Amino acid sequence: MQKLAELYRGKAKTVYTTENPDLLVLEFRNDTSALDGQRIEQFDRKGMVNNKFNHFIMSKLEEAGIPTQMERLLSDNEVLVKKLDMVPVECVIRNRAAGSLVKRLGIEEGLVLNPPLFDLFLKNDEMHDPMVNESYCETFGWVNKQHLARMRELSYQANDVLSKLFDDAGLILVDFKLEFGLFNGEVVLGDEFSPDGSRLWDKNTLDKMDKDRFRQSLGGLIEAYEEVARRIGVKLD
């Protein structure tokens, strides 16, 4: 599938149109950002790792009955996907306390959350992705009640699938974000799932194996990403 014009350039991916109006090419770049894009660095192999990682995870979710935008892997850093009408709200599932939740509530990092929390955030870097709720979504017309309920259902379903996948690999799925869109009126999982948008800890050492290594200047970012990929069975080379 030939990519044509650049449609959108995000913090770590570039989206291209194709000759098929229903399909897009996602190009995963080596860029890594923090602080809503204020800090950006490049890491060799990162685009390739995240692309293959994302393709692997999306394939697992498809097998579990979760509709995704994934079509097929095109190259080391490109994938073909369905063109979705994206919902401007991201879903976050939290299995343990970390990140903004710890700061907001003053609770201990790593606290087990049972049942897992479901949060919603408006996708807006300038406003630092403010937290919203279902009432905001309905009032401002970001997504209707039925589609939001489906997004919630699919988020928890994905959590069940992925928590087991990572647990079997000696990892804790602490939290993660998902983005959804509509394709022919149906809610479909879009964007990506990678260590960029999730928190993954080693089950024995509690070492952070995700983008917190970049946010907190811990070093070893790509080594951690590749180790997670290796453990769950992603073929990188």
From Swiss-Prot:
Gene3D superfamilies: ATP-grasp fold, B domain, Phosphorylase Kinase, domain 1. Disulfide bonds: none annotated. It catalyses: 5-amino-1-(5-phospho-D-ribosyl)imidazole-4-carboxylate + L-aspartate + ATP = (2S)-2-[5-amino-1-(5-phospho-beta-D-ribosyl)imidazole-4-carboxamido]succinate + ADP + phosphate + 2 H(+). Coiled coil: none annotated. GO terms for molecular function: ATP binding; phosphoribosylaminoimidazolesuccinocarboxamide synthase activity. This is Phosphoribosylaminoimidazole-succinocarboxamide synthase. Belongs to the SAICAR synthetase family. Keywords: ATP-binding, Ligase, Nucleotide-binding, Purine biosynthesis. The keyword ATP-binding applies. GO terms for cellular component: cytosol. It comes from the Bacteria. SUPFAM superfamilies: SAICAR synthase-like. The lineage of its organism: Bacteria, Pseudomonadati, Pseudomonadota, Gammaproteobacteria, Enterobacterales. GO terms for biological process: 'de novo' IMP biosynthetic process; cobalamin biosynthetic process. Its EC number is 6.3.2.6. CDD domains: SAICAR_synt_PurC. It holds the Pfam family SAICAR_synt. Pathway: Purine metabolism; IMP biosynthesis via de novo pathway; 5-amino-1-(5-phospho-D-ribosyl)imidazole-4-carboxamide from 5-amino-1-(5-phospho-D-ribosyl)imidazole-4-carboxylate: step 1/2. The keyword Ligase applies.
